[in-house]
Amino acid sequence: MNIDSREHYYYRRVYLSAVRFIDYLSTLPQFDGKNLYVCGGSQGGALSIAMAVLSPKVTAIEAFFPALADQEAYLHGRAGGWPHYFYFHKDDEDIHDIAKVVRYYDTANFARLLHRPIFMSFGLADLTCAPTCTYSTWNAIPSPDKKLVITPQVGHWRKLDVWDQGWKWMLSHKQ
């Protein structure tokens, strides 16, 4: 994963590849030139938020239980986000150098730069992407057009009615 290098870390390539994919999508004849939505859950939720920040072509986001958020929480005695690196390696000698790299790619840090419409949802019983980590992302989003749906007894999955709410919300943002 090259987690000790910001320039060679796995997620750098993932994020840059996703931006290139959005560039490609925008060249297709099916693209209307106005509406490019991104939607994903867990790692895909993190990518959706990052893509909306990194690509001006993205017009709206639907992210559910985004991963890669507040990963350093384990270093401070709280539940951390997926992939739980600091849960397993919190005593490593180079942990503070690694934390700098992970922090750079943290979903909550991307969220601070998000000014596009976003629909977000998560379950309070999620053991993969802790609700506290998802809240850290949500609370950082400055966009005035944002909607949050919380399902108290749901884990790392989505109820059908929340899928429907997200879909209707996305359609309401068609330009």
Please place each PLM-identified region on the residue numbering:
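Active-site nucleophile elbow and catalytic-triad environment of alpha/beta-hydrolase enzymes
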Residues: D94-F110
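Cap/lid segment of the alpha/beta-hydrolase catalytic domain
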Residues: M1-L16, A73-G81
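C-terminal catalytic histidine-bearing segment of alpha/beta-hydrolase fold enzymes
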Residues: Y135-Q175
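Short glycine-enriched nucleophile-adjacent loop
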Residues: S26, C39, G45-P56, I61, ...
